[in-house]
A protein has these predicted regions:
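Aspartyl protease active-site motif detector
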Residues: 32-77, 107-112, 116-119
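Sterically constrained small-residue positions within well-ordered secondary structures
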Residues: 40, 68, 84-86, 97-99, ...
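Intrinsically disordered, low-complexity interaction arms of viral/retroelements
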Residues: 1-43, 51, 158-176
């Protein structure tokens, strides 16, 4: 199974009934996962692409299937109005792009935001080009190494990535 990632998936690890997906901080995008199992659908959603965000942020009350872990960095997060926000840790979120069906992954800082926000500079840092244009066809994230594109959609004054949240569930051979 090939996994296309905004951030490369290094390792999938089960802890209890939740999955930990470790992401590599590199620009490459393709990774083959050598483990038997399947991606389980957790629901559909949207991630807003934010060109002004300092970090990719995730709402406190969303994505319970993805474990929150302590951040390795001490981050001071502020809302657009300058108000300080609590930083509760970070989580790796896996999802399928609605158009290609390919599995993607990103690390988000968990804080007091209303919706998931992907920081453009973080996407660029991972080796991607982020393009906004007047039509949906001109709005995408493109990995510079592979050339693969992820379609974005314009909604009002925002650009969004429509996704299906998924979690890797291993299947152990010989167990029914």
């Amino acid at each position: 199974m090939e996994v296309l990632n905004i951030c490369q998936v290094e390792e999938l690890e089960m802890r209890g009934d939740s999955m930990t997906c470790k992401l590599v901080d590199k620009g490459s995008v393709n990774q083959v996962v050598q483990q038997q199992g399947e991606w389980v659908h957790l629901g559909s959603g949207e991630i807003t692409i934010d060109s002004a965000a300092d970090e990719s942020c995730w709402p406190i009350d969303e994505g319970g299937a993805f474990e929150i872990r302590s951040s390795k960095r001490n981050i001071l997060l502020k809302a657009a109005n300058g108000q300080a926000m609590r930083h509760l840790g970070e989580k790796d979120v896996t999802f399928k792009d609605e158009m290609s069906g390919e599995v993607l992954g990103m690390t988000f800082q968990v804080t007091e935001v209303k919706k998931p926000l992907a920081a453009v500079w973080r996407l660029v840092e991972k080796g991607n080009l982020v393009q906004f244009g007047p039509s949906d066809a001109q709005c995408f994230i493109q990995n510079l190494q592979s050339g693969k594109r992820i379609q974005l959609h314009k909604r009002g004054g925002s650009y969004i990535l429509k996704v299906e949240y998924v979690r890797w569930v291993p299947v152990f051979p010989g167990h029914a």
